[in-house]
Amino acid sequence: MLAASRAALDKDQGDFWDSGRVASDESTWIRYDGKALASGQRVYWKVRIWGDAGQRSPWSVPATWSMGLLQPTDWHSKFIGSVRPEKHPEGAPLPFPWLRKTFNLAQQPARAVAYVNALGYYELYINGKKVDDHVLSPAVSDYSRRNLYVAHEVADYLEPGKNVIALWLGRGWYVRGHPGVVHDGPLVRAQLAVSMPDGAVSEIVTDDTWRVRESPLSPLGRGTAFGDYGGERYDAAKDLPDWNASTLDDSTWQPAAVFTPPPVLTAAQMVEPNRMIETIRAQRVEPFPEGGWVVDMGKAFTGWLEIALPAIPK
């Protein structure tokens, strides 16, 4: 049973779809046969089953899902990124960008959904707080065929008055030399759909009114072939602890540049996100003969390092 509201579902009113009892040996991939659902629509549902002897189970605990953006025309935002030339000298570092946009809300929203479609990786922040536990998001795709977006429920991160939505982009696999990559990236388009208690809906979309600044991170290596993955360079002199806070004065930041990547399919990410699941400690640290240090973590892993460095006397 599917309903447009929790209240209707609690009254056993399946105003979207009430399948009734269906005699079938199928328990998954049941075809939906109800009313047409719209982009961004929230659906409330529950299910029950019958046994061989005709006994009926109680209803399941009510659950919800939200429809994604079903048509290309549902995207009202533009791809944006750093102001930079289309070409650069081989190996020149291109710092990963910070992007942000401030806006005001008259009251606490009833619902807010952020849709983020990044070419490369992204982290989404609202009012200084990261909105999820995802890392290396979105999942990898073939940029010549499709790119992926992720939807985030973010009403709890918003507040009446001044707010800021911010994105930290990373290169990921969006690198020249890979199929479908024509910019030096990374790029992102995003839109925040805000629904007020009175039913009014507004959108915050990525465009050239967003502000951009270089973050402390830039890539090492080109990342275009096996064995050329490189790494990252961190420039602490560029660090700005409150870069994603609504109190920051971003008047010195540059306007974001708008880009037009080749049109390919944009699809919702239909796999679980990457998450950090474990913290491990180094087993051995020793100097490397050619300079630098060798850090032995004791086992193979996918992740990154956290290093505490001594303060440099001024």
Model-derived segments and spans:
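Terminal edge beta-strands and adjacent linker/stalk segments
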Residues: 60-64
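Solvent-exposed, conformationally flexible loop/turn segments
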Residues: 25, 40, 160-161, 288-290, ...
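Accessory beta-strand-rich segments of carbohydrate-active enzymes
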Residues: 41-46, 51-53, 66-71, 94, ...
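Activation corresponds to long, low-complexity, non-globular regions
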Residues: 201-298
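Solvent-exposed, flexible loop/coil segments flanking beta-strands in beta-rich domains
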Residues: 70-107, 117, 260-313
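Exposed aromatic-hydrophobic patches
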Residues: 29-35, 150-156, 296
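Non-cytosolic beta-sandwich-type ligand-binding/adhesion modules
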Residues: 1-16, 48, 129-131, 298-302, ...
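Recognizes extended acidic, P/S/T-rich segments that occur
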Residues: 1-42, 48, 52-58, 75-82
